[in-house]
């Protein structure tokens, strides 16, 4: 999406995730040395929790430098997605401040069948399927939206 946020319909999400993940689930990506340790620190937080507000992820992960870019990279690769919004609470449990994004692995938001449905295809095949789907919108430069 040219470095910007975007929306992907659920009927395209399997191929989109397969393309952006280059055919890897996160553990395999990390084991092959293609994901930094900061990404692993963040993803490990979701082993026991379904969604976590972004400010808590920063505190729990212990990542000081490069936190925002680590989260952005995980979102671009479709390993994390915004699952909702929450607000901080004061000592009296009253909400205050701006809404804050809660992040989750998309498998927990949309279901594993939707997210991993194209894992049997190569990333190149997923790209071809997405380009075919976007072809009617080609005048808008739509296929350029597929590259990270």
List where the protein language model places each region.
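Long, low-complexity intrinsically disordered regions
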Residues: 1-148
């Amino acid at each position: 999406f040219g470095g910007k946020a975007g929306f992907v319909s659920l009927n395209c999400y399997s191929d989109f995730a397969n393309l952006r993940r280059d055919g890897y689930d996160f553990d395999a990506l990390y084991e092959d040395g293609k994901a930094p340790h900061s990404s692993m620190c963040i993803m490990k937080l979701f082993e026991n929790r379904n969604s976590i507000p972004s400010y808590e992820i920063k505190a729990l992960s212990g990542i000081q430098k490069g936190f925002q870019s680590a989260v952005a990279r995980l979102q671009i690769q479709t390993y994390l997605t915004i699952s909702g919004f929450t607000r901080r609470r004061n000592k009296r449990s009253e909400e205050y401040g701006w809404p804050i994004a809660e992040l989750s692995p998309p498998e927990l938001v949309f279901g594993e069948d939707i997210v991993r449905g194209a894992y049997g295809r190569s990333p190149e095949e997923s790209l071809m399927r997405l380009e075919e789907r976007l072809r009617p919108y080609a005048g808008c430069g739509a296929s350029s939206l597929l590259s990270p």
